[in-house]
């Protein structure tokens, strides 16, 4: 389906609108560049404005969380359908990944967390719910 979600876990900007907004901390020209360094073309930058929703039910799914975040893609981690012990293990694992990557973790709702790669700012979360970083 062209223009729609890539898979059942991808979310479009329209679906995300009104919940929170993920934006880069600085513009692409804000940092000094090394000699010969090329900036990302604007079209590719816009394509990176997506995030992935991962509904984790078993601990083995935690690897998807880490791999997605390591690729620089924000993850909306939904643990609402996981058993309590599995949810605790996945959250503990995800917290370690976030810490290791110097990323951010924001609580969106009970058992729902937004994991953001380094250099990402989250706007629009309810005050007192989001905790920038770990």
From Swiss-Prot:
Q: Which UniProt keywords apply?
A: Cell cycle, Cell division, Cytoplasm, Septation
KW Transmembrane (keyword) present? no
Sorted alphabetically, the Gene Ontology cellular component annotations on this record are: cytoplasm
Per UniProt, subcellular location reads as: Cytoplasm
Q: Which organism is it from?
A: Streptomyces avermitilis (strain ATCC 31267 / DSM 46492 / JCM 5070 / NBRC 14893 / NCIMB 12804 / NRRL 8165 / MA-4680)
Biological process (GO), any one = division septum assembly
Which Pfam families does the annotation name?
SepF
Keyword Cytoplasm in annotation? yes
Q: What is this protein called?
A: Cell division protein SepF 1
What does UniProt list as this organism's lineage? Bacteria, Bacillati, Actinomycetota, Actinomycetes, Kitasatosporales
Underlying gene:
sepF1
Q: What is its main location?
A: cytoplasm
Q: How does it assemble?
A: Homodimer. Interacts with FtsZ.
What is known about what this protein does?
A: Cell division protein that is part of the divisome complex and is recruited early to the Z-ring. Probably stimulates Z-ring formation, perhaps through the cross-linking of FtsZ protofilaments. Its function overlaps with FtsA.
Q: Which family does it belong to?
A: Belongs to the SepF family.
């Amino acid at each position: 389906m062209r223009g729609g979600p890539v898979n059942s876990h991808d979310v479009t900007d329209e679906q995300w609108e009104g919940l929170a907004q993920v934006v880069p901390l600085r513009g692409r020209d804000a940092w000094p560049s090394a000699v010969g360094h090329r900036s990302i073309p604007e079209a590719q930058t816009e394509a990176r404005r997506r995030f992935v929703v991962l509904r984790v039910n078993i601990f083995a799914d935690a690897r998807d969380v880490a791999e997605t975040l390591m690729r620089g893609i924000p993850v909306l981690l939904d643990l609402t359908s996981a058993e309590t012990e599995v949810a605790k293990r996945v959250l503990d694992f995800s917290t370690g990944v976030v810490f290791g990557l110097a990323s951010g973790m924001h609580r969106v709702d009970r058992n729902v967390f937004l994991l953001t790669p380094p250099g990402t700012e989250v706007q629009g979360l309810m005050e007192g719910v989001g905790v920038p970083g770990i």
